[in-house]
């Protein structure tokens, strides 16, 4: 699939790729551009919606601008943006398959009557089509076509109605609301009856928004629309009434459900869809089974009447072939989760259209080219900086409720807005009226496979399909345009008790000159609104302590102040306290209760939580709705069956009932998700908003201080450095905030699970007992009435087919925990990865490849003479000539005052340095960090912009050996840790070190010696001993040998030795002709003790065995002996002197890494073939010995 990018707004009309066409059912004309077969772009506002909307019809969160996309420059930007997004989608295999299917999934043609498919009304075809090659071939066919052929519905027509252009989708600009994306079907009936119809996409590529910390990728938004268009092209659009409960709205006890369209739920991905996939019977409706039947109906017509019909052109047949080899189940299983992985893109964790209830969107202007290309955001979704759109001033604010907080005298203190989620609402309790069908016919199991649903698409085949040139138009291919306008009202409610939304509003800055206060009542009662509510106690205490100090008028004073502000914020926002509840230990940030007035307890949140439990955090505590269920009685027609037949029938009924009970369990699980967990999720979102509000307050305090400082007599260069350092600290503040958000996630997810375990699941069991007891009674009575079985057989059947407690243990709490844990762990891929640089080097066929695989797009430049040689566990950089350099450039490397970092690498130095010689560093103007050689040792030096310096000398690393160096800088603890291999060799305070802002370049340099560097990495966090040890041994995983338990094989430790062929039979010592040998225990009935094996290191510095190590093997059964090789028979013989032992090479097998090989002079130790009662351990190259006999296993 090629995307035609040779287009611009001024491309001349050629009636092929650039056309002027009529909008359906109108006299409106627009210019359309074919970017791929059957895929068109119209850089215009959508013609089907008015651009001028009365205020009462404007929707909350929308932006209405009738002038948008009215200029050629805007239309050109729109066209190029859509082309870029389509190329980005097409840049991946799955995206290419999606576009290929959209291109080929043509609606089923009207008028085909050859095998039983007839037009709903063949007399609506319009005039007889023009003569063309395709129709001429059809007329001569023996199959009767009405008016000589079939008609196609997927086309756009020229303004003179003479030319028709094949089209499956047309991508327009937005309609009335310029920030609302939508997909509209051409003909509703065909979109639902299996015929299929073309689609129009309304899309806004020039604006995006943020969710949490990342920008929404417009390619993912367009993909969502493309997937939805497939529902229309396949004719499987569900009814607009097919909705499911999404969340329970509980503001001020007004019970109402939000409803989510099933298509949006299936497509959106995120935790909603993942939760469905943990719940295979989550939804039952005839839509699924009916859609499958319709698909099979048209597929059968295609296979029997079209596929082998030579009268029909390949442009139609081959497209239908591609369409029908992908089932409707494949379409249902398409969701954004697949594409987010393919595009390496982050998506919202909940249904994105409903997120405006939790997050008020601000829009940013997309910059295609500089900040975004076919690989996505150039600097990633988190680190990209896009300008706020000037259209944000036009965002419509229509809250669902206004909460008026009043005091005891009913005087209004503040008004806070509660916004809707943009979904339809209903007061009907879905769960109390929903009947769980006993019949499995309408049940649909969602696919939980990791395989991409469109793998059947052959891109090569699609590319070879001829384009549809001649169109036989079916004129009635579209509905009349309908534009429904909806009004909304705002309800005002009065409360005397402050709600979380009031607490949130009190944390928002409304005055440039503000003061922090922990007294909420004082904040909301202040007349000038100069107080801002805060729970950052340590920070407020610090600011209060220094308020009478002298002015901050030097860079050093500012750095000291900024460092303390950062430390106190980090401490306040991330300090946690353990809560011991009935569900175990949970950990909560201590500010949680105060931030949102949760439990209305001020400082006693933990105590109240322990007393009341996690259910107290939400408003819904009444009983669950019990579902309507129906279970068929056992039919009397079975009474006379034989024991065998009756047993089979009862087993079928018993199994069906168990499945039905599982559906009931999932109904309870879904109620918890919709009615309970949705409230915990709302708390998560509000807590995150509170964190962001506090972060904004702190940033404003810092900004104000910087503004004051800029008025002092500070040199411009110094002031510039302060500004850049401050911006770096702002990033560090955001990182601390994200850590706190993750802790809130974890706490509330655990709380919600606890509610399910303690409140919901027991009610399910209680509910089931009523029905199970009744079923068991009826089952016993039925079996007792059976006439063709004896009493013993009746007893067997009763015992087999009456339900017991064990049959209802559906709860898999670990699966639910894993589900939530995975969500917390995958918050943001870019943020979770601590690596700012992870060096990868390999030798290519024509040149060396040296690149960064951290995902942070580090630019690497190096001297051409730099070589790659095998090092510890892979290719290492070998710098042997003077002044060879490797430079790594990335803005992440610009350290400042508050950011943590770690540098790790393997180093081998083969020279000698008495003078100071630089190795690697990030330093400019004598500020930053540096590692250099001096006095035959290694020195790490860190120096700030004020001249404060700390140096650590490391000896014993210049001796031709490999060493793993880890240097960790923790600015919160003011701690410098240095590790060599797995040992901590330095722990130094760096409290006096302030700003080390230097450059975005890390340079690796060789001056006069030969150095080897491998696995160079830079992390954005400090590391502790445990992590260094884990990394050290993990990297050596391929070079270190392991025992049978996969533990590192140790020198001087006792093991038992087994052969791969006989893994349960150990070796023992055998005396033969006054000599000692080793053999398997083949003598039955004799208790012969196994001998112990011990590998003795030749290199005494080694504690663990590595590949290709030479060692001496000691054997002990009370007396130590050593392995030698008999020159007479090549057997392994035991000698008493270590001096006479052979130095044996130890290795692992390439294909069985858990097995060990021993060799001497390139000959391997193996088991001999059976020799009487013995299989000797021998050393030879006898190829008759089975391969496995050369492999050994050491067990501790």
From Swiss-Prot:
It comes from the Viruses. This is Non-toxic nonhemagglutinin type D. Keywords: Disulfide bond, Secreted, Virulence. Disulfide bonds join 583-754. Residues 409-828 are annotated as: N-heavy chain nHN. Gene3D superfamilies: 2.60.120.200, 2.80.10.50, Clostridium botulinum neurotoxin b, 'coiled-coil' domain, Metalloproteases ('zincins'), catalytic domain like. The gene is ntnha. Forms a highly interlocked heterodimer with botulinum neurotoxin type C at pH 6.0 but not at pH 7.5. Botulinum toxins are produced as progenitor toxins of large molecular sizes of 12S (M toxin) and 16S (L toxin). M toxin consists of a non-toxic, non-hemagglutinin component (NTNHA) and the neurotoxin. L toxin consists of the M toxin and the 3 subcomponents of hemagglutinin (HA). HA is composed of subcomponents of 70, 33, and 17 kDa. Erythrocyte agglutination occurs when the entire complex is assembled. One of its GO terms (cellular component) is extracellular region. This protein can also be encoded on a prophage. The lineage of its organism: Viruses, Duplodnaviria, Heunggongvirae, Uroviricota, Caudoviricetes. Residues 829-1195 are annotated as: C-heavy chain nHC. Residues 1-408 are annotated as: Light chain nLC. GO terms for biological process: proteolysis. One of its GO terms (molecular function) is zinc ion binding. NCBIfam families: botu_NTNH (NF033911). Belongs to the botulism non-toxic nonhemagglutinin family. Its main location: secreted. Has 3 domains that are structurally very similar to those in BoNT/D; light chain (nLC, equivalent to the light chain), N-heavy chain (nHN) and C-heavy chain (nHC). The keyword DNA-binding does not apply. It holds the Pfam family Toxin_R_bind_N. It comes from Clostridium botulinum D phage. InterPro entries: Bot/tetX_LC, Clostridium_toxin_transloc, ConA-like_dom_sf, Nontoxic_nonhemagglutn_C, Toxin_rcpt-bd_N. It is found in: Secreted. Assembles with botulinum neurotoxin type D (BoNT/D) and protects it against pH-mediated inactivation or protease activity at pH 2.6 (the pH of the animal gastrointestinal tract) but not at pH 6.0. The non-toxic component is necessary to maintain toxicity.
């Amino acid at each position: 699939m090629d995307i035609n990018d040779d287009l611009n707004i001024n491309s001349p009309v050629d009636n092929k790729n650039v056309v002027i066409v009529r909008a359906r059912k109108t006299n409106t004309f627009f210019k359309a551009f074919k970017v791929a077969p059957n895929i068109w772009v119209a850089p215009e506002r959508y013609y089907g919606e008015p651009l001028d909307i009365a205020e009462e019809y404007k929707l909350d969160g929308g932006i209405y601008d009738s002038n948008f996309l009215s200029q050629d420059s805007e239309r050109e930007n729109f066209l190029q943006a859509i082309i870029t997004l389509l190329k980005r989608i097409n840049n991946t295999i799955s995206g290419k398959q999606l576009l290929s299917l959209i291109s080929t999934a043509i609606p089923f043609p009207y008028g085909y009557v050859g095998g039983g498919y007839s037009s709903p009304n063949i007399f609506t075809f319009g005039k007889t089509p023009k003569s063309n090659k395709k129709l001429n071939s059809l007329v001569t066919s023996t199959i009767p076509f009405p008016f000589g052929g079939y008609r196609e519905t997927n086309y756009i027509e020229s303004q003179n109605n003479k030319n028709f252009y094949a089209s499956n989708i047309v991508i327009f600009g937005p309609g009335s609301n310029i920030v609302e994306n939508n997909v509209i079907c051409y003909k509703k009936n065909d979109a639902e009856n299996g015929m299929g119809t073309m689609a129009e996409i309304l899309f806004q590529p020039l604006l995006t928004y943020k969710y949490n910390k990342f920008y929404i990728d417009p390619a993912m938004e367009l993909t969502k629309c493309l997937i939805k268009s497939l529902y229309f092209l396949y004719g499987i659009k569900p009814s607009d009434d097919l909705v499911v409960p999404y969340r329970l709205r509980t503001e001020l006890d007004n019970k109402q459900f939000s409803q989510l369209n099933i298509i949006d739920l299936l497509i959106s991905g995120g935790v909603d869809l993942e939760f469905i996939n943990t719940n295979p019977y989550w939804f039952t409706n005839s839509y699924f089974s009916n859609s499958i039947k319709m698909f099979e109906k048209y597929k059968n017509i295609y296979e029997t009447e079209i596929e082998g019909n030579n009268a029909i052109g390949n442009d139609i047949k081959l497209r239908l072939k591609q369409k029908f080899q992908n089932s409707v189940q494949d379409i249902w299983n398409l969701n954004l989760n697949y594409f987010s992985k393919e595009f390496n893109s982050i998506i919202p964790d909940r249904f994105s259209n409903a997120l405006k209830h939790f997050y008020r969107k601000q829009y940013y202007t997309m910059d295609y080219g500089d900040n975004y290309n076919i690989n996505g955001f150039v600097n990633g979704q988190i680190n990209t900086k896009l300008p706020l759109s000037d259209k944000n001033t036009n965002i419509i604010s229509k809250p669902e409720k206004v909460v008026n907080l009043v005091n005891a005298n009913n005087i209004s203190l503040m008004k806070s807005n509660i916004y809707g989620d943009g979904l339809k609402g209903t007061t009907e309790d879905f769960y109390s009226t929903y009947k769980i069908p006993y019949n499995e016919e309408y049940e649909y199991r969602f696919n939980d496979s990791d395989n991409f649903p469109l793998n059947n698409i052959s891109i090569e085949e699609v590319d070879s399909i001829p384009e549809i040139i001649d169109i036989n138009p079916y004129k009635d291919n579209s509905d009349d345009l309908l534009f429904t306008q909806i009004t909304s009202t705002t309800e005002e409610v009065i409360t005397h008790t402050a709600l979380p939304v009031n607490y949130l509003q009190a944390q928002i800055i409304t005055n440039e000159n503000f003061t922090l206060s922990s007294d909420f009542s004082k904040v909301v009662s202040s007349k000038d609104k100069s107080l801002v509510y805060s729970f950052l106690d340590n920070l407020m205490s610090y600011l209060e302590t220094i308020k009478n100090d002298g002015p901050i008028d030097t860079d050093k004073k500012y750095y000291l102040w900024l460092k303390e502000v950062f430390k106190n914020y980090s401490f306040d926002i991330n300090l946690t306290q353990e809560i011991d509840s009935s569900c175990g230990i949970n950990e909560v940030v201590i500010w949680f209760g105060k931030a949102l007035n949760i439990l209305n307890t001020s400082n006693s949140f933990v105590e109240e939580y322990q007393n009341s439990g996690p259910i107290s955090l939400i408003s819904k505590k009444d009983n669950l709705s019990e579902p309507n269920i129906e279970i068929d009685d056992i039919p009397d027609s079975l009474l006379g069956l034989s024991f065998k037949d009756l047993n089979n029938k009862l087993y079928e009924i018993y199994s069906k009932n168990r499945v039905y009970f599982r559906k009931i369990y999932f109904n309870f699980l879904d109620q918890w998700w919709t009615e309970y967990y949705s409230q915990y999720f709302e708390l998560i979102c509000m807590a995150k908003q509170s964190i962001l509000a506090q972060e904004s307050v702190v940033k404003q305090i810092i900004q104000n201080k910087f503004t004051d400082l800029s008025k002092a007599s500070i040199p411009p260069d110094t002031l510039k450095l302060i500004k850049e350092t401050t911006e770096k600290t702002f990033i560090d503040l955001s990182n601390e905030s994200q850590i706190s958000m993750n802790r809130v996630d974890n706490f509330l997810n655990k709380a919600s699970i606890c509610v399910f375990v303690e409140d919901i699941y027991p009610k399910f069991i209680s509910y089931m007992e009523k029905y199970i007891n009744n079923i068991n009674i009826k089952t016993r009575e039925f079996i007792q009435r059976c006439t063709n079985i004896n009493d013993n057989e009746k007893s067997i059947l009763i015992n087999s087919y009456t339900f017991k407690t064990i049959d209802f243990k559906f709860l898999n709490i670990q699966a639910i925990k894993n589900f939530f844990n995975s969500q917390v762990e995958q918050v943001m891929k870019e943020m979770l990865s601590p690596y700012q640089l992870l060096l990868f080097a390999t030798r290519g066929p024509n040149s060396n490849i040296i690149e960064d695989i951290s995902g942070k797009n580090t630019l690497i430049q190096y001297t051409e003479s730099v070589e790659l040689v095998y090092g510890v566990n892979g290719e290492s950089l070998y710098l042997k000539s003077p002044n060879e350099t490797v430079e790594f450039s990335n803005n992440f490397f610009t350290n400042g005052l508050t950011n943590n970092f770690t540098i790790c690498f393997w180093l081998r130095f083969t020279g000698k340095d008495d003078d100071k010689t630089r190795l690697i560093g990030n330093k400019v103007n004598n500020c930053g960090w540096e590692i250099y050689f001096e006095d035959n040792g290694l020195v790490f030096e860190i120096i700030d912009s004020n001249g404060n310096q700390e140096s650590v000398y490391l000896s014993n690393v210049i001796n031709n050996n490999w060493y793993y160096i880890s240097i960790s800088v923790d600015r919160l603890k003011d701690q410098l840790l240095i590790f060599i291999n797995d040992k901590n060799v330095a722990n130094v305070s760096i409290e006096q070190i302030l700003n080390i802002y230097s450059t975005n370049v890390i340079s690796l340099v060789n001056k006069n010696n030969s150095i080897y560097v491998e696995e160079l990495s830079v992390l954005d966090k400090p590391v502790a001993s445990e992590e260094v040890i884990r990394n050290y041994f993990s990297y050596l995983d391929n070079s270190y040998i392991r025992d049978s338990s996969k533990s590192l094989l140790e020198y001087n430790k006792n093991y038992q030795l087994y052969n791969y062929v006989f893994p349960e039979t150990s070796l023992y010592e055998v005396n033969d002709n006054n000599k000692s040998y080793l053999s398997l225990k083949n003598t039955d009935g004799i208790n012969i003790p196994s001998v112990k094996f011990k590998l003795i290191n030749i290199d005494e510095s080694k504690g663990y065995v590595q590949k290709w190590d030479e060692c001496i093997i000691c054997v002990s059964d009370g007396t130590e002996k050593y392995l030698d090789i008999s020159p007479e028979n090549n057997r392994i013989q035991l000698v008493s002197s270590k001096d006479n032992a052979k130095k044996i090479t130890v290795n692992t097998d390439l294909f069985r890494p858990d097995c060990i090989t021993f060799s001497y002079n390139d000959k391997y130790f193996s088991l001999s073939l059976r020799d009487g009662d013995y299989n000797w351990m021998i050393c030879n190259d006898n190829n008759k010995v089975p391969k496995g006999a050369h492999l050994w296993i050491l067990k501790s």
